[in-house]
Regions:
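Catalytic alpha/large subunits of respiratory electron-transfer oxidoreductases
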Residues: 1-235
């Protein structure tokens, strides 16, 4: 068995990452569930689908409307999500969500209905400055990581603010700090870039270094800030 990329030059350049090329091996993993399981006397037991569905129906009926919740994978299809919310709302509950990694929802009203990069994927490699905040981009989005790498190899500056140092295949400037300090670090970098309206965020040497790198590369204001999954999971 082999996995090949779909021919879509503007998105993937007919390229596929190792992560995605070999992901099919999970089909044969010993850890993969192949049948429903029910916990009895503290131990998981494999059962037939009919038995599992009957138990689920009984548990849902026994629970009150406000005690039913549903978490849907964000990679589920539109049809799967529609059916999931139809089922949950039919049971009298509105507790359904797909934001499984997000912890802070205070800015939801300001978020776009359809989040996107703000530019075509192909233009990412043309950026003179890229700032990644809370992102292990090679693991999260290999296709974007490839574009960022091309930008770096073309002379663009790539800087990262993360709770740990990530493994990249191109030059970068990385600021590593505590997870709960990422917001303060970002504010300090912004202040070092000339934004004085950020209160008490005082830039240190590391913040100044990132600011200088971004300033030097982004003289034509061609830059982008990318927020990753690590940042989304932080409060």
């Amino acid at each position: 068995m082999r996995v090949h990329p779909r021919d879509n030059e503007t998105v993937n350049e007919t390229w596929i990452s190792d992560r995605d090329r070999f992901s099919y091996e999970g089909l044969n993993s010993e850890d993969r569930l192949t049948s429903p399981m029910i916990k009895r006397d503290g131990a998981w037991q494999a059962v037939e689908w009919e038995e599992a569905l009957i138990l689920v129906a009984e548990r849902l009926k026994a629970a009150g409307d406000d005690q039913i919740g549903c978490l849907v994978s964000p990679s589920a299809t539109l049809e799967e999500m529609y059916l999931a919310q139809k089922l949950v709302r039919g049971l009298g509950s509105n507790h359904i969500d797909h934001r499984l990694r997000q912890r802070d929802f205070r800015a939801d009203a300001a978020d776009p209905v359809l989040p996107w990069l703000g530019l075509p994927i192909a233009e990412l490699e043309q950026q003179q400055a890229v700032l990644l905040v809370g992102s292990d981009i090679r693991q999260e989005q290999p296709l974007l990581a490839h574009r960022v790498r091309k930008a770096a190899l073309d002379g663009g500056a790539v800087a990262l603010i993360n709770p740990y140092r990530v493994d990249l295949t191109h030059p970068s400037t990385q600021l590593v700090g505590a997870p709960d300090a990422m917001l303060a670090d970002l504010g300090a970098v912004a202040k070092a870039l000339g934004n004085d309206g950020l209160g008490g965020s005082q830039p240190g040497d590391a913040h100044q270094r990132i600011a200088e790198v971004l300033k030097a590369a982004g003289a034509d204001r061609k830059g982008i800030i990318l927020i990753g999954a690590l940042a989304q999971s932080m409060p």
